[in-house]
Curated annotation (Swiss-Prot):
Belongs to the IF-1 family. The keyword Phosphoprotein does not apply. Keywords: Chloroplast, Initiation factor, Plastid, Protein biosynthesis, RNA-binding, rRNA-binding. This is Translation initiation factor IF-1, chloroplastic. The gene is infA. Component of the 30S ribosomal translation pre-initiation complex which assembles on the 30S ribosome in the order IF-2 and IF-3, IF-1 and N-formylmethionyl-tRNA(fMet); mRNA recruitment can occur at any time during PIC assembly. InterPro entries: NA-bd_OB-fold, RNA-binding_domain_S1_IF1, TIF_IF1.
Length: 77
Protein backbone atom coordinates (compact mmCIF):
# COMPACT_ATOMS: atom_id res chain seq x y z
CA UNK A 1 0.00 0.00 0.00
CA UNK A 2 1.33 3.40 -0.95
CA UNK A 3 2.01 5.95 1.77
CA UNK A 4 -0.53 8.77 1.98
CA UNK A 5 0.87 12.29 1.65
CA UNK A 6 -0.51 15.66 2.69
CA UNK A 7 -0.48 18.44 0.09
CA UNK A 8 -0.09 21.93 1.55
CA UNK A 9 0.50 25.37 0.10
CA UNK A 10 3.25 27.63 1.31
CA UNK A 11 5.67 30.45 0.61
CA UNK A 12 9.36 29.92 -0.12
CA UNK A 13 11.33 32.00 2.37
CA UNK A 14 14.92 30.91 1.72
CA UNK A 15 16.96 29.17 -0.95
CA UNK A 16 19.44 26.57 0.32
CA UNK A 17 22.19 24.63 -1.52
CA UNK A 18 21.47 21.59 -3.72
CA UNK A 19 17.96 22.58 -4.77
CA UNK A 20 16.58 22.75 -1.24
CA UNK A 21 14.24 25.47 -0.01
CA UNK A 22 12.85 26.61 3.34
CA UNK A 23 9.05 26.79 2.98
CA UNK A 24 6.63 28.46 5.41
CA UNK A 25 3.37 26.56 5.09
CA UNK A 26 -0.03 28.25 5.35
CA UNK A 27 -0.47 26.74 8.83
CA UNK A 28 2.72 28.62 9.92
CA UNK A 29 4.91 25.47 10.08
CA UNK A 30 8.41 25.55 8.58
CA UNK A 31 9.35 22.75 6.22
CA UNK A 32 12.44 21.85 4.21
CA UNK A 33 11.46 21.23 0.60
CA UNK A 34 13.25 19.90 -2.45
CA UNK A 35 12.25 20.29 -6.08
CA UNK A 36 10.55 17.29 -7.68
CA UNK A 37 11.97 15.66 -10.79
CA UNK A 38 9.23 16.89 -13.14
CA UNK A 39 9.82 20.52 -12.12
CA UNK A 40 13.58 20.01 -12.48
CA UNK A 41 13.20 18.45 -15.97
CA UNK A 42 10.84 21.21 -17.12
CA UNK A 43 13.36 23.92 -16.08
CA UNK A 44 10.77 25.66 -13.91
CA UNK A 45 12.55 28.32 -11.87
CA UNK A 46 11.64 28.37 -8.17
CA UNK A 47 12.76 31.44 -6.21
CA UNK A 48 12.22 32.87 -2.72
CA UNK A 49 8.87 34.64 -2.58
CA UNK A 50 7.12 32.08 -4.81
CA UNK A 51 3.99 30.28 -3.63
CA UNK A 52 4.24 26.51 -4.05
CA UNK A 53 2.37 23.29 -3.38
CA UNK A 54 4.42 20.92 -1.25
CA UNK A 55 3.81 17.22 -0.63
CA UNK A 56 4.59 16.31 2.99
CA UNK A 57 4.83 12.85 4.52
CA UNK A 58 2.48 12.00 7.37
CA UNK A 59 5.40 10.66 9.39
CA UNK A 60 7.93 13.49 8.95
CA UNK A 61 6.28 16.88 8.51
CA UNK A 62 9.61 18.76 8.51
CA UNK A 63 10.57 17.61 4.98
CA UNK A 64 8.63 17.64 1.74
CA UNK A 65 8.72 17.68 -2.05
CA UNK A 66 7.77 20.79 -4.03
CA UNK A 67 5.37 19.55 -6.69
CA UNK A 68 3.88 22.74 -8.17
CA UNK A 69 4.75 26.43 -8.40
CA UNK A 70 1.64 28.61 -8.20
CA UNK A 71 1.35 31.60 -10.49
CA UNK A 72 1.74 35.02 -8.91
CA UNK A 73 -1.08 37.48 -9.54
CA UNK A 74 1.29 40.27 -10.61
CA UNK A 75 3.51 38.28 -13.00
CA UNK A 76 2.97 38.10 -16.76
CA UNK A 77 4.11 34.44 -17.29
Amino acid sequence: MKEQKWINEGLITESLPNGMFRVRLDNEDLSLGYVSGKIRRSFIRVLPGDRVKIEVSRYDSTRGRIIYRLRNKDSKD
